[in-house]
Amino acid sequence: MEIVWIVLLLGAGVIIYNHMYRKKMYREIDRLEAWKIELMNRPVPDELAKVKQLNMTGETEQLFERWRQQWDEIVAVKLPNVEEQLFDTETFLDKYRYRQARKLIGQIEDGLRRLEEEVHQIIDEVNELIGSEEQSRTEIEELRAVHREAKKTLLAYRYTFGAAADLLDVRLTEAEKQFESFAKLTEAGNYLAARGVVQELKQELDSLATMMEEIPALLSECQTSLPAQLAELADGYREMEQSGYILDHLHIERTLAEKQEKIGQCLAMIGELRIEEAKQTVAELKEEIDTLYDLLEKEVLANQYVQTEMPRIGGMLTELAAEAKETSAEAMFVQQSYHLPPSDLEKYRSIEKQMHQLQKRFLLIEDRVAEAKTAYSLLREELEQLVGQIDMMKEEHEQFRLMLQALRKDELIAREKLDDMRKKLSESLRLVQKSRLPGLPEPYALELTEAKNSLQNVAARLEEKPLDMPAVDRALEEAKVSVERLYERTVEMIEQASLAERAIQYGNRYRRRYPAVHKGLEEAEFLFRHYDYEEALRQAVATIESVEPGAFDRVQKLWQADNEDEQ
């Protein structure tokens, strides 16, 4: 019974699905049918009727016939074929041949899409033809006005265009032929070709208008402004030469002739209507002329610099020489008291050598200024280099002088350090005396002797003449290590001795009961009396810990408490 119900449910499901699927497919057929009807009702005939208002000859007639044939084929052949395919689709559905129906629907949709594109193309091309005719008719009248205005300007102001006027006249005359060509193409119905003529004519007249606007200014530059600047440069050059300036290195006369030739080339470019080249050439000429002005101005400024700075630089050298002489005397005095490393002496000899070279170089420059055979700009460069070297040498000299002063300062610092280390050594001895130790271990006594000797070595170094500060510094470093190590060893030794003594006293309570403790403490006392405090502490701790674990911690706490009370 359950199987029967399952079969019935599956059958019902299949029937429902089949019904819904067929309904969906019929909706697709209805959509495609509506699309087909919408294409058939497109206003293509109305658009084609607009074309008939134009001259139906030549290119227009050919285009009209092509569009008409395309539309007739769509209406009479292609759309009826779509209708037949839709009918076949319905037949497949009625026979439940869903796969064939679905495939055919896809083909119909692709076909309608292609027809849609074809219809759009026809309408767009028609609109382009009609629009181009209307736009061309409007623009050609505007271009006629532009052309008339250009001819009037050329006629009225022909003199402002120089040699370019004839070629401008030729170009404007050729433009008139373009108007005639446009009229013939329009009359023949070749509206698209006529549109191309309009665009070419517009580009040509725009170009001519731009040229006619720029040529007068360019001619003014080449015929008036630039030649005037070259003449001014030539006059300025001659005046400066008469005033004693050396300008041979600038080659001004040859450069001015080259600029004059370049102006002639620019005028030729304008006459040939090579306006962009002419504009670039004028810009280059302006930049080159500005450079010439800058070069002459540079010589004037260099002359002012040389005249004003020469005395100041001479004073700088004199002052530096006097300072170097004082430093030389100071260095000789310092050498009697301090040992100067070879590198420092070599540095000072280098300063003296550079000083002589700078003085010699300055005298040579003075001679060249007096001879008046060298350009001021070159003299200025040399003086500026000289000033830079003087500044560098002043810095080196100052560093050397500060080094000499630092030697005495370093000596005082070294003596202060020696005093500090002596105090630290005395503090170590005071701690030993205060601790009332029975004696000093031999290693400690050796360290004490070593520390004293290191301090004596520093003192001896400080008394040497000349004083060798690097050697003093090395001796100071050795003494510092020795004294600090002794101080640390002193504190450690006193602590060990005090703890050993406390541990022995603490362990005395176990002497009678534990023979081993008695023996161990006797060994610790023996070591203590023989100044081996470290080993005595170790022996005492091991002994008391054997009978009372943790005893040493209590001894340490008692010892620390006593120390705090004493402080």
Curated annotation (Swiss-Prot):
Any one of the GO BP annotations: septin ring assembly
InterPro entries on file: EzrA
Extracellular compartment residues: 1-2
Subcellular location: Cell membrane
Keyword DNA-binding attached: no
GO (cellular component) term, any one: plasma membrane
Family: Belongs to the EzrA family.
Protein name in the entry: Septation ring formation regulator EzrA
Source organism per UniProt: Geobacillus thermodenitrificans (strain NG80-2)
Gene name linked to the record: ezrA
